[in-house]
């Protein structure tokens, strides 16, 4: 019985798709088609007019980008600077540092 209910629901969805495709070609489906031309006309040598939403989104994503870059640089700086061991000054000898021996006066 469950196979029949699945088959019936599949047929119902298929019928809806078929009807919506037929209505779309007739213009009854509520689909709005653009009426030719571009929506925002390009202007020669002028900046495009941005909406407040576009300005907000660009500032948000640029702030997020800089946060991510600075966060990664602060916490994983060896990824940028390299994986070189930092020299330990306690292992250097006086001779390597150019310090004369104590007995010379």
UniProtKB/Swiss-Prot annotation:
Keyword flag Transport: yes
Subunit structure, interactors included: Complex I is composed of 45 different subunits.
Chief location category: mitochondrion
GO biological process, one term: mitochondrial respiratory chain complex I assembly
Its job: Accessory subunit of the mitochondrial membrane respiratory chain NADH dehydrogenase (Complex I), that is believed not to be involved in catalysis. Complex I functions in the transfer of electrons from NADH to the respiratory chain. The immediate electron acceptor for the enzyme is believed to be ubiquinone.
A Pfam family it matches: NADH_B2
Biological source species: Gorilla gorilla gorilla
Chain intervals for the UniProt region annotation (Disordered): 85-105
Name by which UniProt lists this protein: NADH dehydrogenase [ubiquinone] 1 beta subcomplex subunit 2, mitochondrial
Keyword match ATP-binding: no
InterPro entries associated with the record: NDUFB2_animal
Location in the cell: Mitochondrion inner membrane
Transit peptide feature, positions: 1-33
Domain of life: Eukaryota
Entry keywords, A to Z: Electron transport, Membrane, Mitochondrion, Mitochondrion inner membrane, Respiratory chain, Transit peptide, Transport
Family assignment from sequence similarity: Belongs to the complex I NDUFB2 subunit family.
Compositionally biased residues, Acidic residues: 93-105
Listed GO CC annotations: mitochondrial inner membrane; respiratory chain complex I
Membrane topology: Peripheral membrane protein
